[in-house]
Amino acid sequence: MGRGKIEVKRIENNTSRQVTFSKRRSGLMKKTHELSVLCDAQIGLIVFSTKGKLTEYCTPPFSMKQIIDRYVKAKGILPEMENRAGPHADNDQVIKELTRMKEETLNLQLNLQRYKGDDLSTVRFEELTELEKLLDQSLNKVRARKLELLHEQMENLKRTEFMLEKENQEMYHWLMSNQIQRQAEVEHHHQQQVMTELKLVEQQQPLMNEFPFFGEDLHLGTLPLLDTHSYRLQPTQPNLQDPAQIN
């Protein structure tokens, strides 16, 4: 039994259509190459996918341009165009293009002079009115852009100010915590000294109870002064003695 005839129609499913296109394209390229080699034929094949991807084949060593030029000559298209254009068609086209570019350049220069206000003596009232409107629109756009940039700068300054304030607060809290910690360490050290002195006093308390004078400070200022006035010198020489005692 032979194969049944397959109906050729567009494949609706995108994935199936893409897979079929890839397979059939490979088969078509293979058949084209075989035909070119077996039959020594010059073949040019151009295929565009639905997404615009180009696939082409041309019989080596020819290029696609050479094959297309041969096709155009075989169809008689190129001679007809040359006969209709004439030998000076290229020169005329270049002259027209240069003229058009000169006119555009001149118009641009005139418009620039008008925008700058350099030469307005030849400008009509209607043109001046239109120019004024254009300048107003341009000025409004410039002002809007300027305000937008100023707003962005203000937002940046606010963010910077917020970050600096946050850093200052963090630094302040850090300094305060360090100061409190140092103060706590000093107070703890002072308490340790007081506790040490109290322990020493408690250790010396039995001795102080047994010897009341133990631990008292002796100051030279509290000692009784010697009575130097109760003593006087006695002369030992006879001539210095009292005459009444001699008699």
Curated annotation (Swiss-Prot):
Name this protein carries in UniProt: MADS-box protein defh21
Q: What is the lineage of its organism?
A: Eukaryota, Viridiplantae, Streptophyta, Embryophyta, Tracheophyta
The subcellular localization recorded is: Nucleus
Domain (MADS-box) ranges: 1-61
Where are its TM segments located? none
This protein's record includes keyword Cell inner membrane: no
The organism is Antirrhinum majus (Garden snapdragon)
Which tissues is it found in, per the record?
Expressed exclusively in a few inner cell layers of the inner integuments of the ovules.
**Domain K-box: where?**
91-183
One annotated Gene Ontology cellular component of this protein: nucleus
Q: Which domain of life is it from?
A: Eukaryota
Chief location of this protein? nucleus
Query: In the UniProt record, does the keyword Transcription occur?
Result: yes
**Single Gene Ontology MF annotation:** DNA-binding transcription factor activity
Keywords, sorted A to Z: DNA-binding, Nucleus, Transcription, Transcription regulation
Question: What is this protein for, i.e. what is its function?
Answer: Probable transcription factor.
* Any single Pfam family the record assigns to this protein: SRF-TF
Biological-process GO terms, alphabetical: positive regulation of transcription by RNA polymerase II
